Amino acid sequence: MTTTAAPKRKRWPIVTGLVVLSLVLLPMAFYTPDIPAATLRAKYTTPASTFMAVEPGLQVHVRDEGPRDAPVLMLIHGSNASLQTWEPWVKRLSDSFRIISLDLPGHGLTGASPTRDYSSAGYVRVVNEVAAAKGLTRFAIGGNSMGGGVAWRYAAAHPEQITGLILVDAAGAPSKTKSEPPLAFKLARMPYVRDVAIKFLPRSLIEKS
């Protein structure tokens, strides 16, 4: 006498449920809500910090450190960075120099540009407005990476103000031949990708960038 095995229970409902559960839990694991600006300001400002209204709707975070009668050095940070880049320099040099550093629009505590101008020319204009507001007529300027590109462009546009130029791995002049932007920049410009990345980009990926 032979017996037939009972049909195996269908596993598709279980598999489907696990997939749906993963799709729900995975975004929650990477969800990174914006930190309120007031919280960031309280954490990262120092007694040397001020917020300068250099343009309508734009308050630039500036630190002014060192003796007021010392030679002036203005430092410009790179892309996806902030004026904190220069804290080791400030610690070493602020006894002999008046060091002015700032967060460029879209970086650090300065926040977004109301005109969405993140071009090199726009950054040069902001640096010039900060210098004018501080009453600077002669100073050295330095920058690293993108900030180095801003620094040399500023020096080229205002040579009469510059006593020295410091470039640390600075961005160079644009190529005469048209080149495609990196894939990451292309993705960042796509509305839906940008909106998702703002909320779900893993912090570990930012820290490694």
Annotate each language-model stretch with its function:
Residues 87, 128, 152-156:
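Short, hydrophobic alpha-helix immediately C-terminal to the catalytic nucleophile
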Residues 29-35, 39-42, 176-182, 195-209:
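Conserved alpha/beta-hydrolase catalytic His-Asp/Glu region
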Residues 152-157, 163-195:
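Flexible "cap/lid" loop of the alpha/beta hydrolase fold
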Residues 2-71, 96-97, 136-137:
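Alpha/beta-hydrolase fold catalytic core
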Residues 50-58, 63-65, 104-142:
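Active-site loop/oxyanion-hole signature of alpha/beta-hydrolase fold enzymes
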Residues 143, 147, 151:
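Gly/Ala-rich beta-loop-alpha elbow adjacent to hydrolase catalytic centers
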Residues 58, 64-109:
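Conserved HGGG/HGGXW glycine-rich cap/lid loop of the alpha/beta-hydrolase fold
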Residues 85-87, 110-116, 176-179:
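Conserved catalytic-core motifs of eukaryotic protein kinase domains, centered on the activation segment
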